[in-house]
Amino acid sequence: MVESAAFPGGYYRNTFEAPEESEGSGSSAQIDTEVTASENSSTPARKCIMLNSNDEDPYGVQRQVISLYNMSQSERKDLIYRLKLELEQTKIVLKNAELQRMNPAAVSSTSDRVGFSTGQKISSRVSNSKKPSDFAVGSGKKVRHQNGTSRGWNRGTSGKFESSKETMTSTPNITLMKQCDTLLRKLWSHPHSWVFQAPVDVVKLNIPDYLTTIKHPMDLGTVKKNLASGVYSSPHEFAADVRLTFTNAMTYNPPGHDVHIMGDILSKLFEARWKTIKKKLPPCSMQTLPAVTLEPNDERKAAISVPPAKKRKMASPVRESVPEPVKPLMTEVERHRLGRQLESLLDELPAHIIDFLKKHNSNGGEIAEDEIEIDIDVLSDEVLVTLRNLLDEYIQNKEAKQTNVEPCEIELINGSRPSNSSLQRGNEMADEYVDGNEPPISRSSSDSDSGSSEDQSDDAKPMVQGDSSKMPETANSEAQRDENTRIDDLFVGSQSTGALEQMDICSQQKLSSDESDGQHEGNILETPASSEKRYRAALLKNRFADIILKAREKPLPQNGIKGDPERLRKEREELVLQKKKEKARLQAEAEAAEDARRQAEAEAAAEAAAEAKRKRELEREAARQALLKMEKTVEINENSRFLEDLEMLSSSAPEQLPSSAEETSPERPLDALGSFNLRGSNPLEQLGLYMKQDDDEEEPEAPAVPKPDETSTERPLDALGSFKLGECNPLEQLGLYMKQDDGEEEEPEAPVVPKPNETSLERPVDAFGSFNLKGSNPLEQLGLYMKQDDDEEEPEAPAVPNLANDVEEGEID
């Protein structure tokens, strides 16, 4: 029994009831609000809605009127909280229903139950067996198609009525997503896809700079998970993530690296397959609904009596909202890669690409005809995607036109017959990976622009010798596929064990032929690899040795073909032996690379030590030279000081120097003629040198030197022939004396030299020829005496004065 109660202000409200099933949608609930009077009106004029317990909503939802007039504040808050909670739960149900409608394979159609706080439950499930009855609109009319058949309606995410045909519009999108899933499975089954099946483990692979270089990591495992969970709303998002996976691999690894080559091969394979899906994408157009007509409804009439202006108006059927296609996005890595590709092909671009670039150049029409200025960062994503497609088409056409590919004959392992690798079927192996620094050998097929027929033929080709039974074909295609399968079994069985070895042999043969041609021309091309790359390649081969050997294993016979058991046993033994040898070789290469690296590190350390030692020696030698230079500077300065002291002594006045002669007779004047002015002292004394006195030698008494006051000043002296020798003999002043002979018995007495005061002043002196020798013989004054005969009496030697500072002849210290 449904109770009715009026809201304050003339409003009536309905609560949620358990909804019944509706076609193509989940649970639905509504809140109907009727405005019967003005809220500002003071009169309590209200118009009630007469509801019968048996009457239901056209969608099977019962109504209940809640009276807010008698509710307390807490009850109102509780009601508001319940309504908000139920609204959130309804949104979740609608979201799940929409997700189920867009991707029914990912979301199951099982019932989803949402619990309400009132204890009621809403069961939403999709049922095609029961359709809702016709609903009344306005004055008893229902919506019908133009052809007379009734049409069902659903509630969409916006709460409006949408046609159930909307589920049919997503069928092409679902088909395209299935094709994307098929393409992903083909990439997943490729021999090179094992590198991209899981996210990059930075710690395990020891590459800490990976996240610095790659800002948006992506892998095929994540793409597969997103595709299964319905994350991608369009195939464009799927293609962007797949391209990002291979772009990251080729960006982080150098061009000669194994992972770079694998990513390039898979990227080309994906682009070739993606063109078929891209052609099937729907254009961006709005899909309109057919017009509807209103017909009278005799089965059900509304029991609502309200003025026409206040009636609940049914929203007109809204056109189905088609989601806008996701615009393709170009990452920074893809932009830089496209720029490098454009620069490499700038000299050979065709006319239509040049016109496209001129149309979208940065400066508009201001540039000359022979100039092209393109800023990759300024162009939009749509323009860059179009440019990339044009470049891809040009490159593929260019590769298709190249006919100078030399066939390489390879001898099979089982020795059956030689085969031509360029004539064999490529299947999914459009490009083969060649170990080392050589580029992969491309086996290009016909152009991929042939349409859907090429896709069907490619799908018909077996990838792992067992997928042909899944594709229903006509009788001719079945026979052709069986024949191709048998041919593939014959070739793959003999080639799978040594696929990479055969490619190595082929590359070596090509290198040998190139070297022979180069020797004739004098040009030999060499591509030496650095030791670091070799070491890294050896480590990778050793790390993934099991996977490499597993990829080279010979597959067992399939499709019911039985071989000779003895031959199979021998082949297995040979395979095990080859596996052991190959693993041992890879380990030996890794060890050799490790030894080479250690030796290089040791040599580098020794060289660094020698360089440090040489630097220390140079520093020591420089310090030694600086010390010697400093010592020489000190010695020069000291010598200059000695010279300055000597110059000062030699230029000093005689009054400042001590003199024994001045002490003897400081007041005696010296005549200017014939006198030796020695500044009152011995020149050796001026230099600080004095004669050393012997202790044993008797010092002779100094002769009495007449004082100047005792000399007669009145005695006339002849001016001619007189020798003024001063006080004593000049030789004696120099410390030179006559040596006495020891053989003489008796030295003659020296004549007594009269003193000046004893000389008679009245004695006449001849003016001519007289020698004024100051009272004595000048020879005697010089120390020369006449030798006396033995018979004669030897005169006594005169007393020779001896200065305190005089010594014997030749005794100078």
Curated annotation (Swiss-Prot):
Highest taxon, organism lineage: Eukaryota
Record carries keyword Nucleus: yes
CDD domains, per the entry: Bromo_plant1
Domain Bromo: 171-277
InterPro entries: Bromodomain, Bromodomain-like_sf, Env_Response_Regulator, GTE_bromo, NET_dom, NET_sf
Record key words, sorted: Bromodomain, Coiled coil, Nucleus, Phosphoprotein, Transcription, Transcription regulation
The keyword Signal appears for this protein: no
Pfam family, one: Bromodomain
SUPFAM superfamilies found in the cross-reference section: Bromodomain (SSF47370)
Biased composition (Polar residues): 30-43, 120-130, 146-168, 649-663
Region of interest (Disordered), ranges: 1-43, 120-168, 432-488, 507-529, 580-619, 647-725, 739-763, 787-813
Biased composition (Basic and acidic residues): 479-488, 580-601, 610-619, 707-717
Subcellular location: Nucleus
UniProt protein name: Transcription factor GTE8
Gene: GTE8
